[in-house]
Every structure is written in structure tokens, then in C-alpha cells.
């Protein structure tokens, strides 16, 4: 069994298509991930913006983010499915660093990531040493 990784995909979607049926477009993308063996962690619309240059005669695009987990070998098949999906103008998928998955997902959910236990003390120590360095510089 291959290792399960967490990925982030940023889509540029057809704004007209998304405006007509935002829930349907989101469901379609999430179903593509599920059909290819993935599990959606977080999905949300990011923004709508005029494109820097026309892409397939589209002047404006809706940026949509999806974070999901799946086995690596299935990614090629999923990329093909994304390319064939009607509302998708462009997409970019990246593999997330395992050390950053929790903070990124917490941020995407709108939550505050507190970090692993004991990490707070290290922040206090670094702040104190920074304060000491500033004080020493001011004295010089």
C-alpha cells in the first residue's frame, strides 16, 4: 500500500459556471477526488478576480482551494479528471510538507493552530533572547 499524502489544489474556475451553481461545482470537484481514492479535508472559495491574461477566452476566474489526502499513484489519474472537468480553467496541485499539514488545514478552516504541546515555551524563550539582544544593542 502506498503512502497517503496531503495535497493542496488551487483551481481557476469559470466564474459564470461557479456563480450559477457554487455548491454543484464544489461537489463535482470533491466527487472527482473521492472517485480517485482521495478524502477531502477542507475546500473553500478563495476569491474571484480578473485574470492577468485571457485563458480560453475567459477574462475572469474564481480561485478555489481544496486540501485532500490520497495515495500518490492515484494523483496522475486525478489530474486528468481535473483537466476534463467543465468548470476548471486551470489547476495546480502540490504535495504539502507533512510538518505543515496541521497548521495549513487549521488556517484553511479559519481556526487558530496552537502547535504541539511545549511549543509555547520555546516562543517565550526566543522572545526573551530577542528582547535582550535589542537591549544590548540600545546600550551600545
Swiss-Prot record:
MF annotations from Gene Ontology: small ribosomal subunit rRNA binding; structural constituent of ribosome
Pfam families noted in UniProt: Ribosomal_S6
Family the UniProt entry places it in: Belongs to the bacterial ribosomal protein bS6 family.
Domain of life of the organism encoding this protein: Bacteria
Record-given protein name: Small ribosomal subunit protein bS6
PANTHER family per UniProt: MITOCHONDRIAL 28S RIBOSOMAL PROTEIN S6, SMALL RIBOSOMAL SUBUNIT PROTEIN BS6M
Keyword field contains Ribonucleoprotein: yes
Encoding gene per record: rpsF
GO CC aspect terms: cytoplasm; ribonucleoprotein complex; ribosome
CDD domains: bS6 (cd00473)
Acidic residues bias spans: 121-140
The species this protein was found in: Rhodopirellula baltica (strain DSM 10527 / NCIMB 13988 / SH1)
Keyword annotations: Ribonucleoprotein, Ribosomal protein, RNA-binding, rRNA-binding
UniProt cross-references to InterPro entries, sorted A to Z: Ribosomal_bS6 (IPR000529), Ribosomal_bS6_sf (IPR035980), Ribosomal_S6_plastid/chlpt (IPR020814), Transl_elong_EF1B/ribsomal_bS6 (IPR014717)
Functional description taken from the UniProt entry: Binds together with bS18 to 16S ribosomal RNA.
Region feature (Disordered): 111-140
UniProt GO BP: translation
